[in-house]
């Protein structure tokens, strides 16, 4: 049977005066309900899946359209688009505890964002988290003098957790509709998770309603789950059974995992009923943990008995994290500046210099700097403590200079050398002397300058003469060895100092840069000009 063509079917209807309504198919990412916000298109661009398109060409067109609506090249320059992409990646790699501060303060540029993160890091390193005393002990600390109160405001958090639900309400696990939604594909699962989790934050029994700004932040964390913000098991949150009685089923879906009672220390009288509420996606757990840890802290922003750190019982199952403090019978709210994250906890200290590290591998890598230089260059024999230092040095022999200055197009083999060179264009001199307030573009120049105030001369020759700079000592030693490394390419005459070669070359070039202000005569050396002024123009001041 022949099928009628759509255009042929529409013609009689139009002739009869019947209005024809064309229904456009809604795109997979919901363009029918288009939101003009660039953030919406960014999320759609990051979450777009190949299965949502009819084919590779359609998928490519959809990605191009989403990217264009996100970055808006018709409104932004290339530099602005580049900065936007760099900022997005920088925010992705930042620790989770910075998210609330960034969203609250809203830095205007990448430099302002980096300065804010650096300031928060320094403040967090200065603050120390003091654990509360165990139950039964009488000693107290400065931060443990007051009892925990649910109404205390913690940092920038406006939501105040209240753990006052009746103990009779138990957790029955997720409803069948939740399980059916979680069994769908990853994209539908993410959307279903957001639809269930966001109402929990809006009007949950344990949490008051939050403002729209916090809801937007929550949505950003939920949709960022696929980027791997960290698994739930890596966090120091452990909910005993007695605390799960006070959590709603929707909140269990959010937290995503039930902790066995035997894995943690619980108060006497706790039941042993096991609750099964484990959504399969680890990224959804990590997304919510990123939100809750940022909003309420990780291990210290809890009510009485909530979030106790797991500890292996004698003869119990292995797997407890080494180095964690013993379980406490209370947790205290910390100041705003304190962020209990592993990036601020540095338990591994170098026995040589006392520098702290958050990972043992970083400590081992640092300790190599105190050992012998085991990596040697086959070209010049220079030794290095780390392999990456040797690889950077080998660029000087291979002629690789990948870093280019955008102002003068000068190339460098290392990024640090380029950054120092760019200060000559910007005039930046970040290193200042505390005695005379003179500024320098390099730290080494400041160190050499400060020796003029202290009188320090650490470089000593065999003859007993001392110098404040190593370069001056090297030039002085040539007087003993007779070395003359600087040679004239015209006449072959050699010199021990570079400035003497420069003065000599003026004889061949005829250059006379020193002029007498009285008579206008020119000379190729400053000493000759001074002698001329003494004999011919005694009244005139000498040229310095």
UniProtKB/Swiss-Prot annotation:
Biological-process GO terms, alphabetical: regulation of transcription by RNA polymerase II
Stretches for region Disordered: 157-189
Record localization: Nucleus
Domain SCAN box: 42-124
Source superkingdom: Eukaryota
Zinc finger (C2H2-type) stretch: 348-370, 375-397, 403-425, 431-453, 459-480, 486-508, 514-536
A single GO cellular-component term on record: nucleus
Pfam families found in the cross-reference section: SCAN (PF02023), zf-C2H2 (PF00096)
UniProt cross-link Glycyl lysine isopeptide (Lys-Gly) (interchain with G-Cter in SUMO2), position: 3, 22, 128, 278, 285
An example Gene Ontology molecular-function term: RNA polymerase II cis-regulatory region sequence-specific DNA binding
Keywords tagged on the record: DNA-binding, Isopeptide bond, Metal-binding, Nucleus, Repeat, Transcription, Transcription regulation, Ubl conjugation, Zinc, Zinc-finger
Family the entry assigns: Belongs to the krueppel C2H2-type zinc-finger protein family.
Function of the protein: May be involved in transcriptional regulation.
Protein's name in the database: Zinc finger and SCAN domain-containing protein 25
């Amino acid at each position: 049977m022949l099928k009628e063509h759509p255009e042929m079917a529409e013609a009689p209807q139009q002739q009869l005066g019947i209005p024809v309504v064309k229904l456009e198919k809604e795109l997979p990412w919901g363009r029918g309900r288009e939101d003009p916000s660039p953030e919406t298109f960014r999320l759609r661009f990051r979450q777009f899946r190949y299965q949502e398109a009819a084919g590779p060409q359609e998928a490519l067109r959809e990605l191009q359209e989403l990217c264009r609506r996100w970055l808006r090249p018709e409104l932004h320059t290339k530099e602005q688009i580049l900065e936007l992409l760099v900022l997005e990646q920088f925010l992705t790699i930042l620790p989770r505890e910075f998210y609330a501060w960034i969203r609250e303060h809203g830095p205007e540029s990448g430099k302002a964002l980096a300065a804010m993160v650096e300031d928060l890091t320094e403040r967090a390193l200065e603050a120390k988290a003091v654990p509360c005393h165990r139950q039964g002990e009488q000693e107290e600390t400065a931060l443990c003098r007051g009892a925990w109160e649910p109404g205390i405001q913690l940092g920038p958090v406006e939501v105040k957790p209240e753990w006052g639900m009746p103990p009779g309400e138990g957790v029955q696990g997720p409803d069948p509709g939740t399980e059916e939604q979680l069994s769908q594909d990853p994209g539908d699962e993410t959307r279903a998770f957001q639809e269930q989790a966001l109402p929990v934050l809006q009007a949950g029994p344990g949490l008051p309603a939050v403002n729209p700004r916090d809801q937007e932040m929550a949505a950003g964390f939920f949709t960022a789950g696929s980027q791997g913000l960290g698994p739930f098991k890596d966090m120091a949150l452990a909910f005993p059974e007695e605390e799960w009685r006070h959590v709603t089923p929707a909140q269990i879906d959010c937290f995503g995992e039930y902790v066995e009672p035997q894995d943690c220390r619980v108060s006497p009288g706790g039941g042993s009923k096991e609750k099964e509420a484990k959504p399969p996606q680890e990224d959804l757990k990590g997304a919510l943990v990123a939100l809750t840890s940022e909003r309420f802290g990780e291990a210290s922003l809890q009510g009485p008995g909530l979030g106790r750190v797991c500890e292996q019982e004698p003869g119990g199952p292995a797997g407890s994290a080494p180095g964690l403090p013993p379980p406490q019978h209370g947790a205290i709210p910390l100041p705003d500046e304190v962020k209990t994250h592993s990036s601020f906890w540095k338990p591994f200290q170098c026995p040589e210099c006392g520098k702290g590290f958050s990972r043992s591998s970083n400590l081992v890598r640092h300790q190599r700097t105190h050992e012998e230089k085991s990596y040697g260059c086959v070209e010049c024999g220079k030794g290095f403590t780390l392999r990456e230092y040797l690889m950077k040095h080998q660029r000087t022999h291979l002629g690789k200079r990948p870093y280019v200055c955008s102002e003068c197009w000068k190339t460098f083999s290392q990024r640090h050398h380029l950054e120092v060179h760019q200060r000559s264009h910007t005039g930046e001199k970040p290193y200042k002397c505390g005695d005379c307030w003179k500024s320098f573009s390099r730290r080494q120049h400041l160190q050499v300058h400060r020796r003029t105030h202290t009188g320090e001369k650490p470089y000593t020759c065999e003859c007993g003469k001392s110098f404040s700079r190593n370069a001056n000592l090297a030039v002085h030693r040539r007087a003993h060895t007779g070395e003359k490394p600087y040679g004239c390419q015209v006449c072959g005459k050699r010199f021990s100092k570079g400035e003497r070669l420069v003065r000599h070359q003026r004889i061949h070039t005829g250059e006379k840069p020193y002029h007498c202000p009285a008579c206008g005569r020119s000379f190729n050396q400053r000493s000759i000009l001074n002698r001329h002024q003494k004999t011919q123009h005694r009244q005139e001041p000498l040229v310095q």
